[in-house]
Each structure stands twice: as C-alpha cells, then as structure tokens.
Amino acid sequence: MHKKGFVYLVGAGCGSADLITVRGLRLLQSCDAVVYDDLIDPALLAQAAHAEQHPAGKRCGRHSMPQSEINSLLVRLGQSGKTVVRLKGGDPFVFGRGGEEFLALQAAGVPCEEVPGISSCIAVPAAAGIPVTHRGASRSFHVITGHTAQTGDTLPESLEALAALHGTLVFLMGLNSLEQIAARLTAAGKPPETPAAVVSGGNAPHPA
C-alpha cells in the first residue's frame, strides 16, 4: 500500500537554533524532506542532514521561489509519501504565509499540521529587555505588517485607528516604511514622545 505523506509547518523560532520547540526539533530529526526559508540557522539544517533539503528562501525583494511554487513543492512531496518539514522562521502563522501553504495542502488532500514557533514579534523585544505587555503600562499588544505601507496601501487596521490604542504596537517588516509609519501615527494623535525602539536584523547574531 502506498505510504501516505504528511507535511508539518514548523516554526523555527527567532534566530538561534535552540529556540525551536522540542516537538519541532524531533520532527526535523525524523523527516524525509525539509523545505526551508532564508535566515534559518545552519545548525538546525544539520539536524536534518539525512533528509532531502529544498531551499525556498524569501526575503524582502529577493524571492528565490514564488509562493505558488513552494505550495506545489509541498504538495508534490506530501503526495509522494514523504514526511515533510516546512521550516519557517518565527511562527508559520504570523506573517509567514503559513496559512496559504496550509490551505494549498488541504485543497490537495495532503495531511498537514502547524507546529508553532516563537515569533519575532515577542522574541526580538524580549531580547532587548522590552516586554510587550507590562502591568500599569501596556495591557495589550498589536502586531501589524509594515510592508504594505510603502506602497501606500491601507494597513490591516488603519494607522489612524492604531494611534488611539494604548497597548504596544509591533510593526514587522516595517524598516523601509519607518518614517511614514511614525508620521501617520503622530498625525493621528500619537504623542511624539511615545517610547519606541527600532530593531534591524533582530534574529541575527548582532542586531542593530
């Protein structure tokens, strides 16, 4: 009987190889194939040295493989009977297009599961000693993509609405739109003296 494949969308955590979950590591060590994004720690890939390895790097402005091709690759590997780890930085379902891959696999009838990872939206502030919630200061936090701002598109929630919130605002992929984000927030009433931190390459050995 033909072996039925399975695809796990595994969050690698943020940066250091030892931030992956125990379950994610075990799946990586036992899989038949791994499809991995850019910025994955080579030490993690070494845990799957026995497996087929397929790079599918995606960084701003540099996509080595279109998303549609990644979806097709995952479906093809799963349908061939392999146990596949789709290794993604952070958490696959937090601005990682994991939802798109999950739906593509479901549509093709390939069994799949998401294995959560530590997202940069909490890991990077934590590494800088910044809690995203703090009693008496921030009772909530909001994660927003900053990438579409540079095209002039409206963000998932308008910046004007976000400016009125009292929680911590975490913008991912927003470095190139930093001036626009700050200007729109202050124009909408966010006090200019609001504490802020800007981190570039927060999952790198020496973030700026």
Show which residues each predicted segment covers:
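Class I S-adenosyl-L-methionine
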Residues: M1-A17, V22-I118, A123
